[in-house]
A protein has these predicted regions:
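Tubulin/FtsZ superfamily GTPase core signature
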Residues: 1-359
Length: 359
């Protein structure tokens, strides 16, 4: 099912745009910005320059986006960027701000991909860019999906395989959530549909997403319906296992007790779903996130597995984000000290304003 009105890539680097595989190669879909200032060679991790260029070329970007078929019928915008680089981290907040100003009432969600551990330890600019990107997007986006690259790394795998695997694992949980409310085939319409309205009412502030699955046993067509109590128990345990996996594989480590809103979607063959299973999943999520307003839905599909997608939003505190801000404040203080402006130790709340906003 095609749930996307259009997919576009924006960059200041010609080489990065040329390396894409699935986005159309024309200039309306691969959008080069800042060519006169960078000669198509990127901004060299200087996120302030990325923000300036995005502000200058924002009309070019939006004009290209508007060419998408069905643009005005879309429910929301979804912007993705790496937090550690220059173009993405600098421009995502700028573009989010302009989209919200032009298309009032249409939510804009940002996906911010956090750097690998080795990037944080070897490149000083990484921490600074990440902190400014997180602060800027949080101030303007309706919700910010946090993706921690380090959670998905396989240490002994080749770099290209690692990146492809990470991209796939990041994207997979979104698919069923986006499809469930757009389904037109009545065979695949759930008894409790999770549609765009449910998603919009759930997403706000810091947000994480995860997916889990459990393989179903193959049954012969002439075996008839399941009647044994052990089979019923097995169905429930598979669904619970899939939810446990989804929560353990959330895109960022969080404390579910700090979550204000959440949703879960059960995707499986219609005959494998029941109200008992949905209730059990809801009870499990409620136990983990007692303070959350929970929404749920089911999505019947022809498949040999049970999939559960979990989204947790309105997260009160994320330790890793706080760490980025703390390190960035220390870095800014050191930079000022080197310029002869002095160094003074202050609380995080008092120093937070020193992190620039790239809008």
């Amino acid at each position: 099912m095609d749930t996307l009105a259009g997919v576009f890539a924006v960059n200041t680097d010609v080489t990065d745009l040329s390396g894409l595989r699935t986005i159309k190669p024309d200039y309306k879909h691969r959008i080069l910005i800042g060519a006169q200032r960078t000669n198509g060679h990127g901004v060299g991790k200087i996120s302030e320059l990325g923000a300036e260029i995005a502000n200058e070329d924002v009309d070019k970007i939006i004009d290209a986006i508007r060419t998408a078929e069905g643009f005005y019928e879309t429910d929301a915008f979804l912007l993705c960027a790496g937090a550690a680089g220059g173009t993405g981290s600098g421009s995502i907040g700028v573009l989010t701000k302009h989209l919200k100003e032009r298309y009032i009432g249409k939510p804009v969600y940002d996906v911010v991909v956090l750097p690998f551990r080795q990037e944080e330890t070897t490149e000083t600019r990484t921490i600074y860019n990440t902190a400014t990107c997180l602060k800027s997007t949080y101030l303007v986006a309706d919700a910010v999906f946090l993706i921690d690259n380090q959670r998905y790394v396989k240490k002994d795998a080749p770099a290209e395989n690692n990146l492809n695997s990470i991209n796939a694992r990041v994207v997979e949980p979104f698919y069923n959530v986006l499809c469930a409310g757009e389904e037109t085939n009545r065979r695949y319409v759930g008894s409790k549909t999770l549609d765009a309205g449910d998603i919009i009412q759930t997403l706000t502030g810091w947000t994480v997403i995860g997916g889990g699955s459990s393989t179903l046993e193959r049954r012969l067509p002439f075996c008839g319906p399941k009647r044994d109590f052990r089979e019923k128990m097995s169905d429930t345990s598979r669904s619970v296992h899939a939810m446990d996996q989804a929560i353990s594989e959330l895109s960022m480590p969080i404390d579910p007790a700090d979550v204000g809103r959440a949703l879960y979607l059960l995707t499986a063959p219609a005959k494998e779903m029941s109200m008992d299973i949905l209730k059990q999943l809801g009870d499990n999520l409620r136990n983990l996130a007692p303070n959350a307003l929970i929404r749920s839905g089911d999505y019947p599909r022809d498949s040999r597995q049970i999939d559960v997608t979990v989204v947790m939003s309105e997260i009160g505190s994320v330790r890793k984000i706080t760490d980025y801000f703390t390190k960035a404040i220390d870095l800014i203080s050191v930079m000022k000290a080197k310029k002869g402006l002095g160094y003074q130790t202050r609380r995080l709340e008092e120093s937070f304003d020193e992190i620039p906003v790239l809008l």
